[in-house]
Every structure is written in structure tokens, then in C-alpha cells.
Amino acid sequence: MRMSAGLSLLLPLWGRTFLLLLSVAMAQSHWPSEAGRDWENQLEASMHSVLSDLHEAVPTVVGIPDGIAVVGRSFRVTIPMDLIASNGELVKVSAVGKEVLPSWLHWDPQSHTLEGLPLDTDKGVHYISVSATRLGANGSHVPQTSSVFSIEVYPEDHSEPQSVRAASPDPAEVVSSACAADEPVTVLTVILDADLTKMTPKQRIDLLHRMRSFSEVELHNMKLVPVVNNRLFDMSAFMAGPGNAKKVVENGALLSWKLGCSLNQNNVPDIHGVEAPAREGAMSAQLGYPVVGWHIANKKPPIPKRIRRQIHATPTPVTAIGPPTTAIQEPPSRIVPTPTSPAIAPPTETMAPPVRDPVPGKPTVTIRTRGAIIQTPTLGPIQPTRVSEAGTTVPGQIRPTMTIPGYVEPTAVATPPTTTTKKPRVSTPKPATPSTDSSTTTTRRPTKKPRTPRPVPRVTTKAPITRLETASPPTRIRTTTSGVPRGGEPNQRPELKNHIDRVDAWVGTYFEVKIPSDTFYDHEDTTTDKLKLTLKLREQQLVGEKSWVQFNSNSQLMYGLPDSSHVGKHEYFMHATDKGGLSAVDAFEIHVHKRPQGDRAPARFKAKFMGDPVPVVNDIHKKISLVKKLAFAFGDRNCSTITLQNITRGSILVEWTNNTLPLEPCPKEQIMALSQRIAEDNGKPRAAFSNALEPDFQASSIAVTGSGSCRHLQFIPVAPPRRVPSEVPSTDVPDRDPEKSSEDDVYLHTVIPAVVVAAILLIAGIIAMICYRKKRKGKLTLEDQATFIKKGVPIIFADELDDSKPPPSSSMPLILQEEKAPLPPPEYPNQSVPETTPLNQDTVGEYTPLREEDPNAPPYQPPPPFTAPMEGKGSRPKNMTPYRSPPPYVPP
């Protein structure tokens, strides 16, 4: 009875106690979620106070995870409509603080997906805002819900295999397709005649989808990047083939995917599905762009790099002593970043020594810095990086950490499963005295002074990501090395890993080549971008400032603009020097080809600028600046579309061609569009053209003349404004052209051919005259030869003598005094017998009066009949009887 009474008294007491405990348990079970929601609302409110496009009264929706994109890889994320617009509200997706999305993203409202393909210029973090609005009573859009998430675009890492970089939806597939650490990756690349910078994000994604349907390769395995420095083909390729494109018009795009690991010509998979369609045009018809060619090459295995780690600070207690263990930890809730968090305290002169603290999670390989100062070993929390702490540590404040490079060694610590590892870009200067320069103070650490480690308190917020750029930052923070050389090893010479080999350039076309980071490798300074590069000639001479090839050692960019005198092969040497003074050399050739279009360009652009042409012609930097400005005026980001033809006097007369125009048939519409873009119909430059070239070049007039397939057309200036496309352009060019292009055509097509024909006729006439005169100086005929006996001595016949002259007087002797006396005359009888007279009767009668009266005198010998003296002809011939007439016949 007493016991039953006691039970009756205890039952109400136990009931009340049980109800109290149950209510407390229920309160405890609901408390964390309420606190989480309250903390989340506080963070969202802090974000809404900063973002201009979101109102403070708009409730936030959590559920869109942050995304990661890689340059050249397709990105796709689906927006959950049940969380944003469950009641059919209007959804708006844009960049935070802007009205539109980033240039590489495309929003598809039908499938509620956000997709795109980033390029190298899109690297960084992009914050995307997704908001739902409803049409209000007054016609305005009233915000209902909103959400903000981030997309970080990582750069393309050439040293990492493609299978690892591929953003595959199945991680197991990525691991299974990955190659070994020392095994090269075989990649097939298709070269397209396309310009990714001119495509919209949807066009890039559609191109990948068409290639997927053609080649049956998944999107996450394909990579699409633009051509850099006109390097269309890979010199290390072991297989290659042509496409259907005869020439390259655009900048070019490379679409590639992985074939396997360490393949060669013997074990490469069947590529007939690429080889024949690329050559015959089937692939081009499917993709919508011309195919230039394809090649297969093996990519070298990656070089191990440091992995930057990010510690998720959590209040979870862990054991400070003993090896790291794996602790079960829920991933922290996503925190929307705000400019108000974290708070950075002002710097002071205190320094925090390295501390150690095991972080729970999956073990991974990280890097620990060994300094020159020996610290006292202590047991405490493990901190994997050296933290430069300023001021007193206050819970809730996050200090930016700075990684100090030095001698590193791997240590096994644990990181959370949700940790995102990132590769920092840090410089590695020479070992020096450890110092940390802040904006106001300089702190030096005493040598070998034991210091009690100060534990860094944990906070519940996410530490920001700190990037250390190699270029000089705007702040005065310097990163120095406090370590010593590794084991006192001597400095090793840099090694040449990949040759530059050959660089192709064209006359009048600007080119630039970025030296790849895997060209040289140094054991101390690592990749090529950490070395000092110098471009030299054969005789160890540096390239001069006036050379047509220039090299920027800071950006490691080689560029130039050759002219017609540089056609051929030129040998140069690239010297890579490490910080210890040791260097390696790579010899390569620059092949300069003739103009890509030659004289077949369909149009020639001429512009007249004010100034002296001599400084422009003699300064390679001014010529390159002119080409870049001309390309910018046409809206081309690729300067190789402009081919500089000539720079002459007459102020500054510049003539160039546009390589984007097809040669045949005549691209009349395209030329007219380009002409109207830069000049008016009367040849006056437009404001956009002038603004693009000023202040260095001030244009006064522009002329566009057809050539090649359009040689009969004149575009700028034109007589009437041509508004109807079907009008045929007039071939009668007015004389208002400042550069007198019409007169040049007249000289080229009329005057010069006429002069050439006249010269040919004149030369032919001179040759005919010479031949005629030589023919007249030939041998005499037989009749003419019988007329003369001796050359130059005339023959006088008897009937040609002049008998009218009187005979000579007998008083003048016929024999001169200096001559010898003749022989005595013969004895003649005294009788005169007519028949013995040696002369004829006429002669005796003629000379009879000349005889002496003395009968005993000898008979007179008459002189020869030629009595007239021969003036200037020398002596007479002695025997002339054969040419005299015979004496008359006298009968006996």
C-alpha cells in the first residue's frame, strides 16, 4: 500500500521530467539549422549591401555550386529552376554588377543551361547572378529570388596530360584514361580556318557539338583553342595530312582530342575517318569551316610543380600529437564572398613563427619551406606554410599568407576532401637574408633566437586565395628566400628540352613568336620563364635596335616585320641564362617568304599621312605600330591580316593589302564594305580610322584601287555614291585622286608598253641598216675586176688622151741631170730608106721638123705618147705597149 502510494506520487514527477527532456532534445535538434540559417542570412545580407543589381529585400536561394572552367574546354552548368523560379517567374542571368553575361558564356532559356568555351583572355573569377522577377501591378519587374555563384577559369596547362585536364563528368573515366607520369600523350589536332575571337559563345559550342557527332568524341575530351603566332602545324608531329582549304584566311583554330598514350605510326588507331573526310571536304561540310589539315603528335610528360594548398579553417578539434589521421568532416556550407570579408588588420612589427597542425582529411603531398633559422622543435598545430602575421590575432579575421620559396621537401599532411588544389605562380629569387617589406615597416628576424610558437586561432570563414604574380606588383611586398642551397650542390647549367627549330615569316607581314615555357629547363630556376633569354647573332652579337627582328626579354616575345630584302633563311641563337650565370643555347632559323598573295591581291589600299617618311622607314618599331593600328582600324585583332607593300615619299604614302580577301572571284562587296569602313566616297578618312591611327599618324586621304581579279574597278574615291549593289563601277577614274592612281594605271597599261614597242622597232631598224651596209662592202664582180690592174692606179686609154695640147718643147730635156747618161745611140746609115723606118709615116712627118740640120746627127727618138704628167700618182708604168693600139699596117 505504501509502495503503491509512492508510485502514484512519482508518476506525475517522471512524466513532467520526461516531457521536459523531450522538449530540450527537440530544441537541441532544431538549434543548429536555425543558427545555420541565421548565419547564412547574415552573409547574404552583407553581399546584397554591395551588389548593386540585387535588392536587400530579395530572399536568397542557395543551391547553385561554384564552377570551374578551363581555357579551351567546354563548360556547362544547369540552373535549378525549382529553386529560382518555381512559380514561373522571369529568370535573368548576368554578371554581377552588369546587365550582360561575360563574353564567353551563353544562356539557353529552353534547357536552363549556362554554357561556353573560355579563351586565354577570359582567365580569372567570374561572378554570375541568377535572379527571378515577377511583373508587378505597375508594369515593373519585382525581384523575387536571387542567387550568386562564381566560375573560375583556369589557364591551359601544357605540361599536364589532356586526360587529366578534361572536365569529365565521370572521375573514374578520367583516372582510367590517364597516362603514366613519364609517358607522353598522343593527341590528334584538326586545323580549322576559323577565328574563335569572332565567334559567339553559342557558335563555339555548336562547333564542338558538330565535331562530336562527326568524330564520336565526347565534349569533355575535346579542346578548342586559337592559333598563336601563326603556328598552325606542330613540328614534332609524326603523322599529318592535308585538308580541303587551299589557303588560310582567318587566324586559325586548333581542335584536338586524345588518341592514347605513347603511340607511333605502327600502333596508332584507325584514322581513316579523319584523313579522307578532311582531304575530300566532308569534314568541312559537317563543321561549317574549311579544314586546313591535321596532325598527330606526342606531348611530353609534365614537369612536377608546386601545388598551392588552401586550408579550410574549421573549429573541429583534432589531436595535436601523433601522425595525421583521417577524420570525418562535413564539407562547410558555401559562403558567398563579399568585399567586407575578410578584414585585414594593419601591419605591425611582430612576426609569427611556423607552427604545425594536422588538418583532418585525405592525405596528400604538400610542400614545406625550410628556412635558414633553426626553430626550437615544439608540439603544436601544424601549419604547412609560413605565415607573416601582422598585429594581434583576433578570431574572425583572416590574414593573407605569402608563400616564401626556398628549398622545399614533401611532407604528408591531410587536407579536406573538398579542398581545391591550385598551382601558384611564384618567383624563385636567389637566397638572401630573410626580410619582409611591408608598406610602412621592415621587420628582420634575429638570428638563431628560439621563439615560442604562437598558435594561430581557427576561424570559420574561408580564407581568400592569394596569387603571387611574377611581374612586379603595385605594392612593395617582396618575396625573398630564407633557405640555403640544397645540400651545397653546385649550380647546374640549364638544359635545352625542346628546340625552337624554325620560324616562318612573310614579307610585309608582322609576326610574333612567344618562346614556349618548355624550351629550356634549369634545376634551380625551373622553367624558361624564370630564365633570362637573349637573342643573338652568329658572332655573339646582340640584335640591334634597327634590326627587322626584335626580342622582348621581359615577356620573352620575338617579333618582327621583314621586307623584300630579307627573303631567305636567317640564323639566330637564343641564349638562356640562369641566376648563377650559366647558359644554354638554341639555334633556330627564320624563313622569310615572299608576300602571301604576291601581286594577286584583289585590292590595294593607299593612305596619305602627314609627316616625313624617313623616320618611319628606318624605325622598325614605328612600322610595326603602323601595321597594328591599320589592323585595329579594320577591326582585326590579328595583325597578320595586313601586308605592308610600300612606304614612299609625298608626305607618307603607305600602301598595303588585306589578306582576308579571297583572290578569286573578285570580292567586290567585301572590298566595298572595308572601303566604307575607313573612308568616305570622296577619299576623306572616317573618324574611326583617324582615331585608330592618331596621334602617331594623321591621315589626310585614302584611296582603294582594284587589282588582280578586280583590276578594272576603282572603289575609293568614287564619282557617284553607289547605293545599288547591282551597279557596275565606272572604269573612268576621275582625276581627283590625291595619289593619282588613274595616272599610274595609264602609265602601266599604255605608256610603258608603247615605249617598249618603239624601242624594239628602233633596235630592229638599226640592225637592218647595219646588215645592208655590210652587204655593199662585198667582193667585186668579174667584170669589175677585169677593169683594174692595180688597186688605186687608174688606166688611161689612148682615145682618152687630150691631143689638143701642144707637144713639149725640145729645149727641156727628158732625162734629168742627176741620172746617168744613156748609152750611145746606134750607128745609122746616112741614106734614108723608107722601108727601114721603125716608125710609121705619120710619126716621121710629125717629128721631122725637130731634127738637127746636121746630117750626121742620130735620128731623134720620140718620147712616149703620154706627155701629160700624173700629179700625185707616182711613176708611170714602164711598159704600156700592151694597151696601145697596134700601128697601122704598111704594105711593103
Curated annotation (Swiss-Prot):
Residue spans of biased composition, Polar residues class: 829-843
Upper taxonomic lineage: Eukaryota, Metazoa, Chordata, Craniata, Vertebrata
Subunit annotation: Monomer. Heterodimer of alpha- and beta-dystroglycan subunits which are the central components of the dystrophin-glycoprotein complex. This complex then can form a dystrophin-associated glycoprotein complex (DGC) which is composed of three subcomplexes: a cytoplasmic complex comprised of DMD (or UTRN), DTNA and a number of syntrophins, such as SNTB1, SNTB2, SNTG1 and SNTG2, the transmembrane dystroglycan complex, and the sarcoglycan-sarcospan complex. Interacts (via the N-terminal of alphaDAG1) with LARGE1; the interaction enhances laminin binding. Interacts with SGCD.
Name of the molecule in the record: Dystroglycan 1
Region (Required for interaction with CAV3): 816-892
Bias-annotated ranges (Pro residues): 856-867
Keyword entries, A-Z: Cell membrane, Cytoplasm, Cytoskeleton, Disulfide bond, Glycoprotein, Membrane, Nucleus, Phosphoprotein, Postsynaptic cell membrane, Secreted, Signal, Synapse, Transmembrane, Transmembrane helix
Basic and acidic residues bias locations: 733-742
UniProt region (Required for binding DMD and UTRN), positions on chain: 877-892
Segments of this protein annotated with the region Disordered: 378-497, 721-742, 820-892
Region O-glycosylated at one site, annotated ranges: 46-68
